[in-house]
Amino acid sequence: MNIIFFGPNGSGKGTQGSILKDKYKIAHIESGAIFRDNIKGGTDLGMKAKAYIDKGDLVPDEITIPMILDRLKQDDCAKGWLLDGFPRNKVQAEKLDASLKKEKMKLDIIIEMLLDRQIAKDRIMGRRLCENDNNHPNNIFIDAIKPNGDKCRVCGGALSSRADDQDETAIDKRHSIYYNDVDGTLAAAYYFRDLAKKDDSIKYITLEGKNALPDVTKELVSKL
């Protein structure tokens, strides 16, 4: 089961990806982690990517896509993989599709999390971190994980928020890229949607991201 997962920051995409990883024993691959692992490991591609990152430049697709393909060939991907965070635009979608076909790597499922942009923004700004345990999710805008006042709903620990979660300009910039359906990330998703219309072996799934986490998971599993 090979999956590409699309969804804006704040949609719960990462959480659902982790659930699929555990349920189906597939690798959950985040594009950012690929860069970090290659740079930390000192690979040729990692060092090339680092040179661009250090200058504040975007890493070219000619470096990024081979890194992704190398990751998809690792042993933990034998039962399948879920790619999260790439492609981010239509051009990357086209290049990734061509590269997967060249490597004879089958793409089975595309998942798109649907979520209103303002709700996504509110969810990001509503995140709170438990100072006792980062694995205790708290969010002032999500009833299921709403804090107890200013304390962690799980352990009663003190809460704080990340600076970048409160940076409206940065959030708006990321969402402008994602919600761009002409050449941004949604355009990448729609490229694969159109591909699925012509290829019955590829399934395109949409999920209502505004629903409660268990309901989203139930909907997702029922559609796979």
From Swiss-Prot:
Q: Its pathway?
A: Purine metabolism; AMP biosynthesis via salvage pathway; AMP from ADP: step 1/1
Cellular localisation: Cytoplasm
- Which Gene3D superfamilies does the record associate with it? P-loop containing nucleotide triphosphate hydrolases
Detail which positions bind AMP: 31, 36, 57-59, 85-88, 92, 162, 174
A biological process from GO: AMP salvage
Family annotation (HAMAP family): Adenylate_kinase_Adk (MF_00235)
Q: Which family does it belong to?
A: Belongs to the adenylate kinase family.
Domain comment (free text)? Consists of three domains, a large central CORE domain and two small peripheral domains, NMPbind and LID, which undergo movements during catalysis. The LID domain closes over the site of phosphoryl transfer upon ATP binding. Assembling and dissambling the active center during each catalytic cycle provides an effective means to prevent ATP hydrolysis.
Report the protein name in the record.
Answer: Adenylate kinase
